[in-house]
Amino acid sequence: MDIKRAKQEIKDAIEAYLVKDECGKYMIPAIHQRPILLMGPPGIGKTQIMEQVARECGIGLVAYTITHHTRQSAVGLPFIQKKQYGGKEYSVTEYTMSEIIASVYDKMEVTGHKEGILFIDEINCVSETLAPTMLQFLQCKTFGNQKVPEGWIIVAAGNPPEYNKSVREFDVVTLDRIKKIDVEENFDVWKEYAYQVSVHPAVISYLDARRENFYRMETTVDGRMFATARGWEDLSRLIQVYERLGKKVDREVVHQYIQHWKIAKDFANYLELYVKYRKDYGIEKILEGTYGEDTLEKLKVAAFDEKLSVVNLLSGRLAGAFKDTYEMDRYVSALYEWLKKYRALIREVEKEGMSEELYASGGIIKTIYFRAKKEFEDQKKAEKLDRDGERCMAKVVDTLEGYWNYAKEEHLAGNEAFEQIRELFADETEKREEMIDHTMEMLEHAFEFLEKAFGESQEMVVFVTELNTNYYSIWFLKENDCGLYYKYNKGLLFDERHQEILKQMDEAEESMERGIR
């Protein structure tokens, strides 16, 4: 199955494992909570989905790459203990707590999560000395003489033998005690993820055109050559920073991430053309609606690959605008929720009678600011926020601090302070509306340009399909009406339905012919 389905399977299993009955006991006892084993090629996102699942389920996560550990750190260090058996004293070997189990308890203390995921990566690549320990871990849920705390689910990941020479096969006894999920690479699923994490548009469009290069693992006389999803994402981050610094990404740089020389050269050439077309066609001018007729004429006579590159350039630029608009909306909505709490606190204080501290300049907004700051710190400590969520909440806290400072400097309190802060918040909502309007104008200009250049062609289908793939464009189009999008999307859906009907008719005809024969 693909990584998206695997994530859902893991999430469903964890939710089932953590359901309790009316007595507060787990409905599936720990002994029957099978460890989950993810088996799949390296670099397809096994570790990332564990972070996402933990965050979405609101539980903790402790992750270890077991190949980085010795038997002593996994099991614990031995020490001699005196014990009485049958009236005689004996020296017995005991073990200190496993470093891994100790990390689980540390995580529980720091985050407050009593339930979570213990994720062990590369579990089938351990050394000979650790192999029996790993079997014991999967079968008995213990490291040495220490059990994994109740409420913590074991998830392990490994690579099939064809990807790693040091792989050890699990025996049937072990496999019969685990929930095994085989994961395969899938570009369409990765593409959805790529849009969400803002992978560089050149990487997405290149892989969309050359899907066979998304994941490749080959053994040659010169050694192993490979391209992985992890490599493409990390290369994307580098390209984005290099563009900001004005540095060039050539084939040598690409090969440092995509360690398949043929693919690295091919992508480097594609990236060079991508940058050239962005400059030659003036993508920003197209989206502003200020392009010249010469741009249209040039595109009309261009080769299909060049036309497709321009469509991808427009999609890529719009993808950034959609995400910026989404983040602005998320920030303003979060700020609005805190200002509602601010208004509620003012009413509560008025009803109960103001204290001197709250009556002082900016006293109430100061209270709201510190509450927001504490909630932000608690969420970070509990690892409940992803990178975008953390950035959004940090901006909200900074804005609330600015409101407090403003009220303090202007000696504002109570309703007077609220009215002034409400005006400041109106500026933020106005900025959001301006950003939405600007993004809509860009989208409409893109449609108008493509309409003039291609009409209802294959290029327009590609453009609309990209809009239907991107998480942020889907959100934007749900929240804001775009007539041109609905026009062409309706045509696309009709064509797809028409093709589906023709296919069904062909299948029915073939079935009838087989029946006659």
Regions found by a protein language model. Give the residues of each.
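AAA+ P-loop NTPase catalytic core and its hallmark functional loops
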Residues: 1-212, 217
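Charged/polar, solvent-exposed surface patches and flexible loops
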Residues: 8, 12, 16, 55, ...
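Alpha-helical lid/collar subdomain of P-loop NTPases
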Residues: 196-359
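Terminal-proximal interaction/regulatory segments of ATP-powered molecular machines
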Residues: 300-517
